[in-house]
Amino acid sequence: MNKIKQVVTLLLFCILILSCNRQRPQLPSNKGVETDSNTLSLLTINQNLAKKEDAYLKKVVLQKDKTFKKSEIGFWYKIDQSGRGQAIKDSTICKISCQVSTLNGKVLQNDIKQLVIGKKLVVTGLEEGLKLCKKGDSAIFIIPWYLAYGMKGNEPLIPPYTSLIYKIKVFN
């Protein structure tokens, strides 16, 4: 009788283990992922806010300095001083001095960082901006909120929906 209990227990344990490895059914390729109306509303609101921010930043940047260029992904940049070092690309280890401020000039952060490009260790706008630089460059990036800390911010230092100015120097 004891042997039967052991066999049944072992059998149930094996069935339990095997059922855990079963793949979940996939969504058919002809059906899209359903989103509710609240999600769509929030998406539309954020897209409209991003468009308004882009228009506002364009106005601010062009009033400030017409030598700024707009990147493909939406931030503004200006290389102040061109270095003679290697171009920065993914997997490059670089050391930068970085001053972060709001559009009205309030300095939020001023420090030296060492980072590996492509590892998402800094906000998207800064990482993509650094890829436009060479070692030895000094640059200014004006990064919209959606390429910085987004709608959540980085409280208490950076409020939600805050566009930022990064003044950077890339060391050799």
Task: Annotate the PLM regions.
Residues 9-17:
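Bacterial N-terminal signal peptides
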